Amino acid sequence: MAYFELQPAESDLQQLAEQYWEKIGEKEQQLEQAAFEAGESIRNGEYTLANLETIVRWKSERVVHYLIANSEAQIRRILAVAASPETSTRGAINALTELRGVDLPIASAILACIEPERYTVLDFRALEALGHARHDVDFYVEYVAFCKHLADCRVIEPQQELPGPTRMHALERALWEWSRSRPELDEFPESVFAAHLAAR
């Protein structure tokens, strides 16, 4: 079982999420906007390579070219599974990682764009802000549950005017910005993990 400890103060989260958006630059803002629009299209049944590429480009331009190795039928089938409300987090991740070019962090970004109220992006900066560094599918399931618990406690408000206007995505932005704004990246030993996953 994973343990998380929120590093920034809860009272700083909203401001950190706002700073994230201000600092990322116009190109990144456009990529994020397009990614969440593609996620909405997937949620509405448009299971296409173009939508998948748009989301992957937002998180990792260098792996987009791997996506063309997947057949259109495979992409349609896997995106349908991932977008289904009945699919578990584990099932959605396992389906998405069957695609060439999609690893766990990319799969988490795809899910966050499709269902921003349900999922968040697995990112090393956000993990640092929770005092954690490792990740696998089991870890991601617990990470989503912890972030969902924080979001449900209303420690942060949705950024209604931005892509993915949910508490989950605002929290991911805040955690990312907290990590980026630190003077140096520290390694987090296992002894740092003091807070038990409260969402259970």
What are these regions (language model features)?
Residues 91-131:
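Catalytic DNA-binding helix-loop module of base-excision-repair DNA glycosylases/AP lyases
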Residues 11, 41, 60, 71, ...:
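Generic serine detector
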Residues 1-53, 119-200:
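C-terminal accessory module of base-excision DNA glycosylases/AP lyases that mediates lesion recognition
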